[in-house]
UniProtKB/Swiss-Prot annotation:
Record SUPFAM superfamilies: Actin-like ATPase domain
CDD domains: ASKHA_NBD_TsaD_bac (cd24133)
Family according to the record: Belongs to the KAE1 / TsaD family.
Record protein name field: tRNA N6-adenosine threonylcarbamoyltransferase
UniProt keywords, alphabetically: Acyltransferase, Cytoplasm, Iron, Metal-binding, Transferase, tRNA processing
Function field: Required for the formation of a threonylcarbamoyl group on adenosine at position 37 (t(6)A37) in tRNAs that read codons beginning with adenine. Is involved in the transfer of the threonylcarbamoyl moiety of threonylcarbamoyl-AMP (TC-AMP) to the N6 group of A37, together with TsaE and TsaB. TsaD likely plays a direct catalytic role in this reaction.
Cofactor comment: Binds 1 Fe(2+) ion per subunit.
């Protein structure tokens, strides 16, 4: 089965072609980072307009790269949520229109299920069951995964997502958007131990997260440094390191608890923050000590992309899942509501 995947949940326009027998044939991505940088974050209306501008050229690019014509495509998968409604509607409308014109089915895919399954595009994919850490700008969740659509939520953030906390903290100390990569970059030049930030909710049982207090702690630390006239580049580096260490250690502690609670030895990390090198190193060390394995997607498939949507859609379409031509998207969509295959 040959599936065209379309991703437009936020500020990246992603298109890909995935074949159930040959694997990923082509993928293309346009990031809107430069467009939103001047505003310090994503502007929904601008995101939607840019998706409209980029979608068809990217589809043509992917078809040309794969040497494919529309008559060869068996189905279209598109991100139906969660995400920005206007942005989602661009992808959904395009998918349904093309599906109607080409006489093929279109299927809405859950954005986070796409992220969760992205490591399966690698040469050594994880086997079910496993624990997944979904960590991005909008989500921080621990999920037990027994199969596609068989998801048990173990814990989630009670306020800010980890990626959101990265971006907001970066903005508070004067770094550019997107803040996560900027903090990671400065952290490599930080002096360890100058600042020590708390590891939120690790002193109590449970698998939930909270990052709003950590963000406030970072802000107070920065304001104290500014008041003392110590607001130079090295202080930004030191705060970045302390903040990143706190987030990474918190996520690692919670992942270890989840693995012990479930008795599993396989961990998948997915979502934009999973590209963070410090997080990967920490989880790899923890899994090595537990004699387990950690899996993640290649860096370009950690952030939003069309390949993960094409793959996830292909799995569901092959299992017989169908959808009407109605255009329906959801800004909020709990993954536990998905049907099992």
């Amino acid at each position: 089965m040959l599936v065209l995947g379309l991703e437009t949940s936020c500020d990246e326009t992603g298109v890909a072609l995935y074949d159930s027998e040959r694997g990923l044939l082509a993928d293309a991505l346009f990031s809107q980072i430069d467009l939103h940088r001047a505003y310090g974050g994503v502007v929904p209306e601008l995101a939607s307009r840019d998706h409209v501008k980029r979608m068809l050229p990217l589809i043509r690019q992917v078809l040309a790269e794969a040497d494919c014509v529309p008559t060869e495509i068996d189905a279209i998968a598109y991100t139906a949520g969660p995400g920005l409604v206007g942005a989602l509607l661009v992808g959904a409308s395009c998918a349904q229109a093309l599906a109607f014109a080409w006489g093929i089915p279109a299927l809405g895919v859950h954005h986070m299920e796409g992220h969760l399954l992205a490591p399966m595009l690698e040469e050594q994919p994880p086997q079910f069951p496993f624990v997944a850490l979904l960590v991005s700008g909008g989500h921080t969740q621990l999920v037990r995964v027994d199969g596609i659509g068989q998801y048990e939520l173990l814990g989630e953030t009670l306020d800010d997502a980890a990626g959101e906390a990265f971006d907001k903290t970066a903005k508070m100390i004067g770094l550019n958007y997107p803040g996560g990569p900027e903090i990671a970059r400065l952290a490599t030049q930080g002096v360890a131990g100058r600042f020590v930030f708390p590891r939120p909710m690790t002193d109590r049982p449970g698998l939930d997260f909270s990052f709003s207090g950590l963000k406030t702690f970072a802000l107070n630390t920065w304001q104290q440094c500014v008041s003392a006239g110590d607001d130079g580049e090295q202080t930004r580096c030191d705060i970045s390191l302390a903040f990143q260490q706190a987030v990474v250690e918190t996520l690692t502690i919670k992942c270890k608890r989840a693995l012990k609670q479930t008795g599993l030895k396989r961990l998948v990390i997915a979502g934009g923050v999973s590209a963070n090198k410090a997080l990967r190193a920490s989880l790899e060390k923890m899994l090595a000590e537990m004699k387990g394995n950690v899996f993640y997607a290649r860096p370009e498939f950690c952030t939003d992309n069309g390949a993960m949507i094409a793959f996830a859609g292909c799995q569901r379409l092959q299992a017989g899942q169908q959808e009407s031509l109605a255009i329906s998207v959801q800004a909020r969509w709990p993954m536990e509501q998905l049907s099992a295959l």
